[in-house]
Amino acid sequence: NPLASPDVIGITSGASAAAVLFLWLGGVTGTSLLLAPVAMGGAFVVALGITALAWQKGISPARLVLVGVGLAAGLTAVTTLLLVLSPDATAMNAYIWLTGSLYASQWHDVTALAPWLMVCWPLALIKLRHLDAQSMGEDMALGLGSALQGHRLLFLMLAVALAGSAVAYAGAVGFIGLIAPHMARRLVNSGHTGLLPIAALIGALILLYADWVGRVAFIPRDLPAGIFVAGIGAPFFVYLLYRLRRELG
């Protein structure tokens, strides 16, 4: 589905809601080391909820997106309510994380992310041929021997693990997961084995560029990278909706 991305289907919203709830319950002091695991746990809980609600003799990509959009809206409302009820210091700390920024990132964050990448990335690359088969349609995938629902569930969990870990340490930077794959498809006319690394590289470059602009364009102010990414991603999302409507007639 061209509209499916972690922020659209609610994975990012789940991580955000869990992080803000944690800050609201525990305050600001001493929470930085636990914030990332809590956010990652929130992403997995939401993913399980989406899977359960969207399951009807298997997972339908269209149904998955619809359920995810609904959950994302509800979780955004919960997050907003928690921010309103939070003390000013807690709300400010949560706001910085919610907008997405590399400002407080340290090398120990890279060390914490490494195990997720070392496990999830090779597994994703090994299984990508099944994603190529599924992109040709359900009947073709079944004919080629792909376990349709099992692999869909596996790819969903891998996506949650990779996206959730990134959100946990960089904050809720929206639309990168939507923009990068579409840009990669324009550059790489091949299967997912070549597409995935290029999309990951493009996503990283977008985030680094947005972070650089936020640091140097408004000196002495330091604006979060998520603001600039959202400024590009929101119009791009509208464009995808328009293009999808035309394709569907």
Q: Can you describe what each PLM-predicted range is?
A:
Residues 1-249:
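Alpha-helical transmembrane segments in inner-membrane proteins
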